[in-house]
Amino acid sequence: HYGRLVPAAEIVRAPAAASRRSVRMAWEQIGLPAMVRSVRPDVVHSPHYTMPVLARVPVVVTLHDATFFTSPELHLRSKAEFFRAATRVAVRRAAGLVVPSQATRDEIVRLLGTDSARFTVAYHGVDHGRFHPVPPEEQARVRGTLDIGDLPYIGFLGTLEPRKNVPALVRAWVRASEGMDRPPALVLAGGRGWDTALDAAIAEVPRHLTVRMPGYLPLDDLPGFLAGATVLAYPSLGEGFGLPVLEAMACGATVLTTRELSLPEVGGDAVAYCGTSATAIAEALRELFAAPERRESLSVAAKERARTFTWAEAARHHLVAYEKAAARR
C-alpha cells in the first residue's frame, strides 16, 4: 500500500534474520547499520519495538502496546524485561514512534514521560479480501472440521496466553450454559502460549459440555469460523489494538469483548462489552444468547464499522510518520 501511495519511493526490505533472539539482535545492531550505510535510505522503519541504535539515519519504531510495563505478570519475565528495555531505547532515540491506537500512545506517554507529538497513531487494517461474510454453506463446512456436530458455538481466536483471559472465558461459558436446553460448544482457536491456568479451567469443565481446542486454523477457514460463531468472545485484559476483534467484525460476527485499553477504539458501538471477570462474561453471554435481534443488529454494525479500517489508510499514516522523521535529518 505504501508503494502505491508513493510510486517513486524505493522500498528496501532487510533480509530475514535468524529466529534466535540473540542472533537476530546482533544482526540488527551490526548487520543492519552496515546495510543502511550501503543503501543510504531516508528513513529506516523498525516494526517491532527494537531499533538499530548505530544507524545514521532517522529511525521510526513501532511500539505495539505498553502491557510489558502495566501488566508484566501477563508475560514471561524475560520477555517483559527485554521489551521494556527496547521500548525505553526507542522512546529515547527514535526519530518517530508509530502506535496502533490512542490508548497505546497515552499509556507510553504516561509511563515514560515523552511528548505525545512524537507519536503517529496508525490503526491496523483488515484484509477485506479474506475477512468478509461467507454463506451458510461455508460456515457449515468449517463447522464440520471442528467436531462439534450441529451445536451453536462460542468462538475465540488468538494466542492462548494469560493476557487473553481465556480461563475466565472457560469458567464464564460453563456458568452461562447452566439451565440451557442446548448448551453451546466452546471453540478456542489459536496457538498455545504459557497459560497453565487454562489447563486447570479446562479440567473442570463438566463432561456434558463440549470444548474444542483445534490449534491454528487454516487461513481459508477463518471467515467461516468467525461468521459461524453465535458469539465471538475476546475478553482480553489489554491490547495494543486487538486485530482478532476487527477480523471478526469484518466477517459479520457478533463480538463480545472488554473495554480494556484499545478495544473500544476498534469496536466502537458495533460490539458488545463486558467486564473481565468470569461472572461478568457469563452474564453478557447469557444476554446475547437470549437476544437474537441484538446479535443481528451488532453483526450489521460490525460489518459497517470494519469497512473503515483498511491497510491503505494505515499506510497513509505511516507515510506521515516517515515524512516527519525524514524532516529531522
Language-model regions, residue ranges each:
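Carbohydrate transferase catalytic cores enriched for Leloir-type hexosyltransferases
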Residues: 1-329
